[in-house]
């Protein structure tokens, strides 16, 4: 939420998109329109883009909501129903973004996508660096494993004020007998071990997201898919 310029943006269109938008509305001082000014997508997996369906004619019947997507993600939405209907009916307006190219949303707010390794059956997978006038955030809701990324997550945490990171699975026990190579994510217990090298100030930056089990574990900081914050 950038109240200085009356703008609201959402990162991820989850199945709970209506709740996400209502939550953003609570922080908006001037812009009381429930619909956001734009939605940033990371990839084409169910929990990250399926909320777009609620912008269609059977639901909100939105008008040209700006949806920011990477090239493969954009093409996927344009060429596969029911998502293509959102484009045809002008419920959404797709804006193609590119890796490492910043999008200036307001004079106070900038988002920069970057590629991360993940199951890319239908689209690329990206995270975002989000920069306000005073603080920055790292947003990586899904990634295969931290050591498969060409950057050090520990070093990237040090560069920002907040780090919203993948915590889909707490440990292997959570997925029983399923092959983790088919649904790869960094286990929370692996992340905690890796982040031990960070000092207490750096560790406090980490907020685990895309989580079920951790959400109810009071000893670990956690949040939901999308985060809500004032531009600062």
Predicted feature locations:
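Cap/insert and terminal regions of metallo-dependent hydrolase folds
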Residues: 136, 144-228
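Active-site metal-binding motif and surrounding structural segment of the metallo-beta-lactamase
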Residues: 6-68, 161
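Core dinuclear metal-dependent hydrolase active-site scaffold
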Residues: 1-26, 30, 94-156
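Short, electropositive alpha-helical surface patch
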Residues: 19, 26-29, 100-101, 215-232
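A short, active-site helix/loop in glycosyltransferases that binds the activated sugar's phosphate group
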Residues: 72-82
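Short, well-ordered alpha-helix to beta-strand connector turns
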Residues: 36, 89-91, 160-161, 167
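Structural beta-sheet core signal
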Residues: 67-69, 138-139, 208
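Short, conserved loop/helix-junction motifs that constitute active-site signature segments
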Residues: 31-34, 57-63, 86-88, 154-159, ...
